[in-house]
């Protein structure tokens, strides 16, 4: 489980001309030419050349595989993570509701609604904007399955227009046990928000997830898409009508996923996703009318996470202007303010804000750094927004001249992709430790991930029951590698100084979370498509492979 504090800062002062294929090639050519700013990894170009090329398609495939390891409920016959089994089959029984399904957020067995919904929102956003890239890599079906496993659960948990089940399990009792999910004996108490105990942040985030997913399924399953949109609209109405933070209503969540940023960002986020899903101007007006009072255009943010949605919603609002949305014209003034804040975040990632304190820190090895606990969640979400915004700029009507407007100098779309790529590469092993922070990728990766199911022998190999204390005695404390590889999991990652200790007890660094991996699905898909495009273009230009001398130059 991850905790975090929002970094809210005072506001600072202040027709397509190319084909898609050409844009892909031009962007990647620029990306390849730009330095990755990994100063501490400066053992030299020779060491870099000796490394094998990174396989973004494999990273994408394993990212989606990870979500199957996090499944709760009755697993399907198509389950590919075979060391897992059915779990949580009586969830909701005490309360008389069916809450079987959904995802475990990290290395334990609580189902927390807020980070689960954010995970699905990010998976859906990536599937909307980069559908062709995911499909080109052959992973579209798995992406849909990952999204649907979450949305099926959200529909179940929304048992009444003004009732939503926020959590199943209890973090305190869960942490006293080290068991496989198939054996768990901890509390499966369920907690809800309703009229008297509101949760606008949770309702808003879940509405955003369902609205985004409704777009994903619009063509392949119109009936299901309509169902998701119906629940999204009801949940938004619930969150807006009965306002309050869910952690004020549910004490048990405060130590794990407290909503530090409040609920205003989730309501704006949900409204913009509903506008994108429906095209109804009423949702856009909501985001415009509440832009100031809800902080949408008042806060300059250097974090995008399961808690703080401002940067994400600001990018969504900016997209309306970049796309030339007809409804945006009447609200251009406010939407320009949203765009300014979106660009403040992106410029902060690039280090292009004049005031250094307004920029995101970097480790010596080039990792974007926000805080010590599970920092890679912030690097992955930043990589996504950089990738998405560069895509919007490249696809806009003024793509030939479009650039990110930063106080320290404009940045082209290719430069944003370059930074996103540097974060992806850092995660995959291009870092000072030469260690992949994606489990199962590459030759070296964390072997002692803080994850109950992965750290205990599979029940399919040894079906004997393992109790709470026995799990700690026999499995948690042992120094050997986990018996099950949690493939595709992105762990919390290294310190500000690029230091990492592979220890099961070091949960700040070795625990993986669903929202670490979710944003990277689209990033890996995009990078795979771009590298494939440039390879194809090079082959088309020189189908015979060129002369030996030219091939030598190409390798350099």
Curated annotation (Swiss-Prot):
Enzyme class at the top of the EC tree: hydrolase
The enzyme's E.C. designation: 3.2.1.4
Keyword annotations of the record: Carbohydrate metabolism, Cell wall biogenesis/degradation, Cellulose degradation, Glycosidase, Hydrolase, Polysaccharide degradation, Secreted, Signal
InterPro entries, sorted: 6-hairpin_glycosidase_sf, 6hp_glycosidase-like_sf, Glyco_hydro_9, Glyco_hydro_9_His_AS
Gene3D superfamilies linked: 1.50.10.10
First-listed, main subcellular location of the protein, grouped into a coarse class: secreted
Keyword Secreted applies: yes
A Pfam family the protein falls into: Glyco_hydro_9
GO cellular component, one term: extracellular region
Catalytic activity: Endohydrolysis of (1->4)-beta-D-glucosidic linkages in cellulose, lichenin and cereal beta-D-glucans
Keyword Nucleus part of the UniProt annotation: no
PROSITE patterns: GH9_1, GH9_2
Family: Belongs to the glycosyl hydrolase 9 (cellulase E) family.
Name used for this protein in its record: Endoglucanase 22
Organism, as annotated: Oryza sativa subsp. japonica (Rice)
